A protein has these predicted regions:
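Conserved donor-binding/catalytic core segment of Leloir-type glycosyltransferases
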Residues: 101-118, 124-128, 280
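Carbohydrate-associated surface elements
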Residues: 69, 85-88
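A charged, aromatic-enriched C-terminal amphipathic alpha-helix characteristic of glycosyltransferases
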Residues: 243-247, 260-290
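Nucleotide-activated donor-binding/catalytic signature segment of Leloir-type glycosyltransferases, i.e.
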Residues: 135-149, 153-178
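Acidic donor-binding loop of glycosyltransferase active sites
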Residues: 61, 167-169, 183-200
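Membrane-proximal helix-turn-helix segments that form the acceptor-binding/catalytic region
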Residues: 6-17, 30-31, 43-63
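Acidic anion/phosphate-binding donor-loop and adjacent secondary structure
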Residues: 36, 89-104
Length: 296
């Protein structure tokens, strides 16, 4: 499993020496990762990266990654028929999550780091406009946004610019056990995708814990990316494009109206269970069995 992708090079040598099956599992891309272009590489080093990547992708018995967009990228670099086995959630948390009582306020929460690349500017603008317009009865009185995790200064400045300081609570750190309780008491779970060139392939591990809670997910990101595929497959939420401010406003209004009508209920969706680590482990077992069988 990589990164670090040096692990694949170790596996490559073991595969050669002992003639044993080799699965190269990419939790993140190699040369397509978003910060790769920022590395201070010489032409020789860049060529070496691509050469080693090609060797790994073409010599492994099977290449696996966590999303469909990344699978296409790896195939473009030489891999054949890349298998997609996504990240998932720990099935032991499901019952604990579902016993949590909802907040009385209309609470939208984001769990995890909100860096500069995750500054959903149009979301904050839409929220600020809805508060100022004051056309939704009790919206400003009920609204509460919680950001649980580190928040970049650029995000804080955007919040201030839209006069939302009194509606947003930033909680820098709480233990994981408390995090899952906090997210399950929220009416809506926010997911901000990095606004970067590889945004289509970004599918944070957090989305799976979100799905396990059964709370509706509101994501900001590419509507044709891997996160959109997962949300559509599981009917766990909605995703709106980074720049679609009107679309964002419409979703917030719809969610708030459902909150008022007590319709933001916790959903038990059997499709979500396919993304428990137990189910995903079975997928991996089947993959390993196939590889072993083809060698016999």
């Amino acid at each position: 499993t990589g990164p670090p992708h040096s692990m694949h090079l170790i596996a490559k040598e073991l595969h050669k020496k002992f003639n044993i099956p080799w699965i190269a599992d990419f939790r993140d891309p190699w040369t397509d990762i978003d910060f790769f272009s920022e590395l201070k590489l010489t032409k020789r080093s860049l060529k070496k990266h691509h050469k080693l990547q090609y060797q790994v992708l073409t010599e492994a018995n099977k290449v696996v990654t966590v999303g469909w967009d990344w699978a296409k990228g790896l195939e473009n670099h030489g891999a054949k028929d890349v298998a997609v086995i996504t990240n998932g959630y720990d099935f032991n948390i499901e019952e604990k999550l579902r016993k949590v009582e909802l907040s009385s306020d209309f609470t939208m929460s984001h769990v995890g780091i909100v860096g500069a690349a995750r500054n959903a500017v149009r979301f904050w603008e839409a929220l600020g406009e809805l508060v100022k317009e004051d056309t939704l009865e009790n919206f400003s009185k009920s609204l509460k946004v919680r950001l649980i995790g580190q928040v970049d200064n650029s995000v804080i400045e955007t919040i201030k610019k839209n006069d939302l300081e009194s509606y947003v609570e930033i909680i820098p750190y709480i233990p994981h056990e408390e995090v899952i309780v906090e997210q399950s008491s929220s009416h809506v779970l926010l997911l901000f995708i990095n606004n970067s060139p590889n945004a289509k392939g970004i599918m944070t591990g957090k989305i799976f814990e979100y799905m396990a809670s059964g709370r509706p997910i509101f994501a900001i990101g590419p509507t044709d990316g891997d996160t959109a595929i997962i949300l559509n497959k599981t009917k766990s939420g909605v995703i709106i494009d980074f720049e679609d401010k009107e679309g964002i406003k419409n979703v917030i209004v719809d969610l708030f109206n459902k909150y008022k009508e007590n319709q933001l209920v916790t959903k038990n969706n059997e499709n979500v269970e396919n993304y428990s680590r137990r189910s995903l482990a079975k997928e991996y077992v089947n993959l390993i069995k196939k590889i072993v069988e083809t060698r016999q």
